[in-house]
Amino acid sequence: MTRILDNDLIGDEGSVERTLRPQYLREYIGQDRVKDQLMIFIEAAKRREESLDHVLLFGPPGLGKTTMAFVIANELGVHLKQTSGPAIEKAGDLVAILNDLEPGDVLFIDEIHRMPMAVEEILYSAMEDFYIDIMIGAGDTSRSVHLELPPFTLIGATTRAGMLSNPLRARFGITGHMEYYQTADLTEIVERTADIFDMEIKHEAAYELARRSRGTPRIANRLLKRVRDYAQIMGDGMITTQITDKALTMLDVDQEGLDYVDQKILRTMIEVYQGGPVGLGTLSVNIAEERDTVEDMYEPYLIQKGFIMRTRTGRVVTEKAYQHLGYPYEKTIKT
């Protein structure tokens, strides 16, 4: 069953996000540190009439990495060509993409950490010196062909920056860490989305929805659609704080933005492992989830909210988690 709080795209959300996508940095809400840096770097590159240095955007899913890539291209006034790591299966696939670039273009590779190593190695010379050497033919008739490339900007996006090889990571001149959004920024995003889709929402309701959206715009916009449905059927269409709370409670999204899977993780750690420490692999088996899913989708928010700590011997539940779930806190828990 799909989680309402899943960070990844669900259904037609890709087209919805394109509708909501800001075009320029001044329209982009949140991520101020990344925006401020990019504003300087982009303006400097434009004044020198050079391509922007290659950019690596990393952080949890749903925080606007793809949107930021499009905004960068718009700010530069150039075209953006989009692909993803899993879509580039062979070296020839990447060569075809690179050979199609025009001077100054932006090449956006989502999930760049999932590129095969043979493909990644072609990027090294392309990023550093704007050329590639490829082998044509086979056996005794094979020969090396040198292809010059126009200056371009590669923007890579990843949720797993640690999985990038050192040679690839070193070739990005600009890195942007996309962080979970502040509630005030998410409130503004919710109100902007409501305005675009002609929804009526009280400011206090937008704040409540934002507060329970795990710091993620994608989740906030998804919850807004479900709260709107609830308001239309169970109310008069106006999204109020009371309507928002009832709708989110119905969706099993609690006051801290946790759903049943998050609570299952915490309850399992408390009831089965006495609060920990417990290894991630062991915990994943117990709750019947993939290890990578727990590490990428659930754990970051639980750590950010202070419900779980990472220690040398495993994950440990915090006193805050005990209190939130109504368990007596054991002072002897090992950390």
From Swiss-Prot:
Binding of DNA, residues: 291, 310, 312, 315
CDD domains, sorted: AAA
Region feature Small ATPAse domain (RuvB-S), mapped onto this chain: 182-252
Keywords: ATP-binding, Cytoplasm, DNA damage, DNA recombination, DNA repair, DNA-binding, Hydrolase, Nucleotide-binding
SUPFAM superfamilies reported in the protein's UniProt record: P-loop containing nucleoside triphosphate hydrolases, Winged helix' DNA-binding domain
Renumbered residue ranges of the record's region Head domain (RuvB-H): 255-335
Residues the entry annotates as binding ATP: 20-21, 62, 65-67, 128-130, 171, 181, 218
Pfam families given in the database record: AAA_lid_4 (PF17864), RuvB_C (PF05491), RuvB_N (PF05496)
Coiled coil (UniProt feature): none
Positions annotated to bind Mg(2+): 66
Keyword Ribonucleoprotein attached: no
Region described as Large ATPase domain (RuvB-L): spans on this chain: 1-181
Gene Ontology terms for molecular function: ATP binding; ATP hydrolysis activity; four-way junction DNA binding; four-way junction helicase activity
Compartments reported by the entry: Cytoplasm
GO biological process: DNA recombination; DNA repair
EC number(s) per entry: 3.6.4.-
Reaction catalysis annotation: ATP + H2O = ADP + phosphate + H(+)
Family: Belongs to the RuvB family.
Subunit and interaction comment: Homohexamer. Forms an RuvA(8)-RuvB(12)-Holliday junction (HJ) complex. HJ DNA is sandwiched between 2 RuvA tetramers; dsDNA enters through RuvA and exits via RuvB. An RuvB hexamer assembles on each DNA strand where it exits the tetramer. Each RuvB hexamer is contacted by two RuvA subunits (via domain III) on 2 adjacent RuvB subunits; this complex drives branch migration. In the full resolvosome a probable DNA-RuvA(4)-RuvB(12)-RuvC(2) complex forms which resolves the HJ.
Notes concerning its domains: Has 3 domains, the large (RuvB-L) and small ATPase (RuvB-S) domains and the C-terminal head (RuvB-H) domain. The head domain binds DNA, while the ATPase domains jointly bind ATP, ADP or are empty depending on the state of the subunit in the translocation cycle. During a single DNA translocation step the structure of each domain remains the same, but their relative positions change.
Family annotation (HAMAP family): DNA_HJ_migration_RuvB
Protein name: Holliday junction branch migration complex subunit RuvB
